Amino acid sequence: MNPVAGDDVVVIARDVTKRFGDTLALDHVSLDVHRSELLVLLGLSGSGKSTLLRCLNGLHPVTSGTVDVGGTRVDQASGAQLRALRRRVGFVFQHFNLVGRLSCLENVLIGGLGRLRLPRYGALTYPRHMRAEALAHLDRVGLADYADRRADTLSGGQQQRVAIARTLMQKPALLLADEPVASLDPENAGVVMDLLFRVCIEEKLTVVCTLHQVDLALGWAHRLVGLQGGRKVLDRPAVGMTRDDVMAVYQRVEPAVTPARRV
């Protein structure tokens, strides 16, 4: 019998395999992700992290295996079903994907377009309650005072926070974040990871995030999953893990101080 996501399980992936031509990107990866869990995928470039993330919302169709997200069988979904699913699955990209010439408020409002019948042009064309909601999300990420600023005038860390606010505007059940801090300095990377952690806890939102930074993963993740050559080689709660435990995924050990965990 095929697994069906229950009340506490948001993602169920079973034996997921993905090939791009002759290249095996994922090799029989199985994974459960629970509600209000921040799960970090770790591994070298090319290990399959981003591919797995995109298989979870159907951006990459699986070659074999099954993916269930909130009761929707992604691997069997029609185009209409995938569009409906993506309205419930937020995606935060490494390079922000904001519309630079639009204000921060307008960029956040774009996250709510899936709830409207027709496209909108300009913040004032959105319903008043949605404008208030978008402002609340900007306030949540500490950028309410920047609502009228063009997005392309903000720093990288600020732009990523706007992107998270836009994703929250979708009211997602699942948030996927692909290397969300890769282009940020350490201070802003910590701010963004802390924001994702707080959203996960306070909104009971499930977050699956790919990272390269082991120390950030140890500091903020509830659970760590390591990929190596497309195979899952690590799946453990982050509590009690050391940097050396995690670096086995990378087949090397680098000395560093592990930060105190967030509670």
From Swiss-Prot:
The keyword Transport is assigned to this record: yes
Catalytic activity reported: phosphate(out) + ATP + H2O = ADP + 2 phosphate(in) + H(+)
Residues engaged in binding ATP: G43, L44, S45, G46, S47, G48, K49, S50
Cellular localisation: Cell membrane
Gene Ontology biological-process annotations: phosphate ion transport
Keywords recorded for this protein, A-Z: ATP-binding, Cell membrane, Membrane, Nucleotide-binding, Phosphate transport, Translocase, Transport
EC number: 7.3.2.1
ABC transporter domain segment(s): 11-254
Major subcellular site: membrane
Protein induction: By phosphate-limited conditions, via derepression by PhnF, and probably also via the two-component regulatory system senX3/regX3.
Molecular function per GO: ABC-type phosphonate transporter activity; ATP binding; ATP hydrolysis activity; ATPase-coupled phosphate ion transmembrane transporter activity
Membrane topology listed for this record: Peripheral membrane protein
GO CC aspect terms: plasma membrane
Subunit structure: The complex is composed of two ATP-binding proteins (PhnC), two transmembrane proteins (PhnE) and a solute-binding protein (PhnD).
Known function: Part of the ABC transporter complex PhnCDE involved in phosphate import. Responsible for energy coupling to the transport system.
Recorded family membership: Belongs to the ABC transporter superfamily. Phosphonate/phosphate importer (TC 3.A.1.9.2) family.
Stated name of the protein: Phosphate-import ATP-binding protein PhnC
Organism: Mycolicibacterium smegmatis (strain ATCC 700084 / mc(2)155) (Mycobacterium smegmatis)
